[in-house]
Protein backbone atom coordinates (compact mmCIF):
# COMPACT_ATOMS: atom_id res chain seq x y z
CA UNK A 1 0.00 0.00 0.00
CA UNK A 2 1.20 3.51 -0.80
CA UNK A 3 -0.08 6.66 0.90
CA UNK A 4 0.09 10.30 -0.08
CA UNK A 5 -0.81 12.79 2.63
CA UNK A 6 -0.67 16.57 2.61
CA UNK A 7 -1.88 19.20 5.02
CA UNK A 8 -2.29 22.94 5.29
CA UNK A 9 -3.48 25.39 7.93
CA UNK A 10 -6.44 27.46 6.73
CA UNK A 11 -7.29 30.72 8.47
CA UNK A 12 -11.00 29.96 8.64
CA UNK A 13 -13.21 27.96 10.98
CA UNK A 14 -14.04 24.32 10.35
CA UNK A 15 -17.59 25.16 9.23
CA UNK A 16 -16.33 27.47 6.48
CA UNK A 17 -13.81 24.91 5.19
CA UNK A 18 -16.47 22.17 5.20
CA UNK A 19 -18.93 24.40 3.33
CA UNK A 20 -16.37 25.17 0.60
CA UNK A 21 -15.20 21.53 0.35
CA UNK A 22 -18.70 20.10 0.07
CA UNK A 23 -20.16 22.74 -2.27
CA UNK A 24 -19.62 20.45 -5.26
CA UNK A 25 -21.33 22.83 -7.67
CA UNK A 26 -18.68 25.51 -7.01
CA UNK A 27 -15.53 23.33 -7.33
CA UNK A 28 -14.91 24.26 -10.99
CA UNK A 29 -14.63 27.91 -9.92
CA UNK A 30 -11.71 27.42 -7.53
CA UNK A 31 -10.34 23.85 -7.60
CA UNK A 32 -7.41 23.23 -10.00
CA UNK A 33 -7.25 19.49 -9.24
CA UNK A 34 -10.79 18.17 -8.77
CA UNK A 35 -12.60 19.61 -11.75
CA UNK A 36 -16.05 18.34 -10.75
CA UNK A 37 -17.92 16.22 -8.23
CA UNK A 38 -21.53 15.26 -8.75
CA UNK A 39 -23.89 13.00 -6.87
CA UNK A 40 -25.66 12.60 -3.58
CA UNK A 41 -23.62 13.33 -0.44
CA UNK A 42 -24.62 10.12 1.34
CA UNK A 43 -22.50 7.28 2.70
CA UNK A 44 -22.74 4.27 0.39
CA UNK A 45 -23.69 6.31 -2.67
CA UNK A 46 -21.62 6.54 -5.84
CA UNK A 47 -20.47 9.98 -6.92
CA UNK A 48 -18.79 11.06 -10.15
CA UNK A 49 -15.41 12.75 -9.76
CA UNK A 50 -13.28 14.30 -12.51
CA UNK A 51 -9.65 15.11 -11.71
CA UNK A 52 -6.77 16.65 -13.62
CA UNK A 53 -3.32 16.26 -12.01
CA UNK A 54 -0.71 18.83 -13.07
CA UNK A 55 1.01 17.65 -16.27
CA UNK A 56 -1.08 14.49 -16.13
CA UNK A 57 -4.04 13.01 -17.92
CA UNK A 58 -7.45 13.82 -16.56
CA UNK A 59 -9.80 11.05 -15.57
CA UNK A 60 -13.36 10.55 -14.40
CA UNK A 61 -14.34 7.79 -12.00
CA UNK A 62 -17.26 6.74 -9.80
CA UNK A 63 -16.17 6.12 -6.21
CA UNK A 64 -18.38 5.14 -3.29
CA UNK A 65 -18.65 7.53 -0.34
CA UNK A 66 -17.26 5.83 2.77
CA UNK A 67 -17.62 8.75 5.22
CA UNK A 68 -19.40 12.07 5.15
CA UNK A 69 -19.15 13.40 8.72
CA UNK A 70 -20.16 17.06 8.75
CA UNK A 71 -17.29 19.43 9.62
CA UNK A 72 -14.95 16.45 10.17
CA UNK A 73 -14.30 14.02 7.32
CA UNK A 74 -15.18 13.22 3.70
CA UNK A 75 -13.82 9.94 2.31
CA UNK A 76 -14.42 7.87 -0.81
CA UNK A 77 -13.13 4.65 -2.36
CA UNK A 78 -12.47 4.46 -6.08
CA UNK A 79 -11.43 1.41 -8.08
CA UNK A 80 -9.83 1.01 -11.48
CA UNK A 81 -11.49 -1.99 -13.03
CA UNK A 82 -11.93 -4.71 -10.44
CA UNK A 83 -11.08 -4.51 -6.73
CA UNK A 84 -7.41 -5.23 -6.20
CA UNK A 85 -6.15 -3.83 -9.50
CA UNK A 86 -5.76 -0.18 -8.42
CA UNK A 87 -7.85 1.12 -5.54
CA UNK A 88 -7.69 4.59 -4.03
CA UNK A 89 -9.19 5.65 -0.71
CA UNK A 90 -9.25 9.45 -0.95
CA UNK A 91 -9.84 11.49 2.19
CA UNK A 92 -10.24 15.00 3.52
CA UNK A 93 -10.01 15.46 7.29
CA UNK A 94 -10.73 18.77 9.03
CA UNK A 95 -9.21 19.39 12.46
CA UNK A 96 -10.05 22.45 14.52
CA UNK A 97 -6.88 24.31 15.51
CA UNK A 98 -8.83 27.11 17.18
CA UNK A 99 -12.01 29.11 16.46
CA UNK A 100 -10.37 30.76 13.44
CA UNK A 101 -8.07 28.06 12.05
CA UNK A 102 -8.50 24.59 10.57
CA UNK A 103 -5.94 21.94 9.71
CA UNK A 104 -6.96 20.53 6.31
CA UNK A 105 -5.55 17.03 5.79
CA UNK A 106 -5.83 15.72 2.24
CA UNK A 107 -4.62 12.28 1.28
CA UNK A 108 -5.12 8.99 -0.46
CA UNK A 109 -4.21 5.37 0.28
CA UNK A 110 -3.46 3.36 -2.85
CA UNK A 111 -3.56 -0.42 -2.98
CA UNK A 112 -3.67 -3.16 -5.58
CA UNK A 113 -1.31 -4.59 -8.16
CA UNK A 114 -0.82 -1.36 -10.13
CA UNK A 115 -0.23 0.76 -7.00
CA UNK A 116 3.22 -0.77 -6.66
CA UNK A 117 4.38 0.37 -10.12
CA UNK A 118 2.72 3.77 -10.38
CA UNK A 119 5.40 5.99 -8.80
CA UNK A 120 5.46 8.85 -11.34
CA UNK A 121 1.67 9.12 -11.37
CA UNK A 122 1.63 9.32 -7.58
CA UNK A 123 4.03 12.29 -7.61
CA UNK A 124 1.70 14.15 -10.00
CA UNK A 125 -1.21 13.28 -7.73
CA UNK A 126 0.59 14.73 -4.71
CA UNK A 127 1.28 17.91 -6.68
CA UNK A 128 -2.44 18.07 -7.47
CA UNK A 129 -3.33 17.68 -3.79
CA UNK A 130 -0.99 20.52 -2.85
CA UNK A 131 -2.44 22.78 -5.56
CA UNK A 132 -5.93 22.03 -4.29
CA UNK A 133 -4.84 22.71 -0.70
CA UNK A 134 -3.55 26.15 -1.67
CA UNK A 135 -6.72 26.86 -3.64
CA UNK A 136 -9.13 25.84 -0.86
CA UNK A 137 -7.11 27.95 1.57
CA UNK A 138 -7.45 30.96 -0.72
CA UNK A 139 -11.17 30.33 -1.26
CA UNK A 140 -11.88 29.95 2.47
CA UNK A 141 -9.85 33.00 3.45
CA UNK A 142 -11.62 35.40 1.03
Predicted ranges, named:
Residues 2, 45-47, 90, 102:
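Short beta-strand micro-motifs in enzyme catalytic cores
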Residues 17-21, 27, 47-49, 65, ...:
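Hydrophobic pocket/interface hotspot
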Residues 38, 55-101, 109-111, 138-139:
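Hydrophobic-ligand binding "helix-grip"
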Residues 50-54:
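Short aromatic-glycine motifs in intrinsically disordered, low-complexity regions
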Amino acid sequence: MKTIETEIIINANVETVWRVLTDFHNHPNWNPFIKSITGEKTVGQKITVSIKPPDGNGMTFNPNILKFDQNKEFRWLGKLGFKGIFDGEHYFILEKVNDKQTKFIHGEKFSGILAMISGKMLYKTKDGFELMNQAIKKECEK
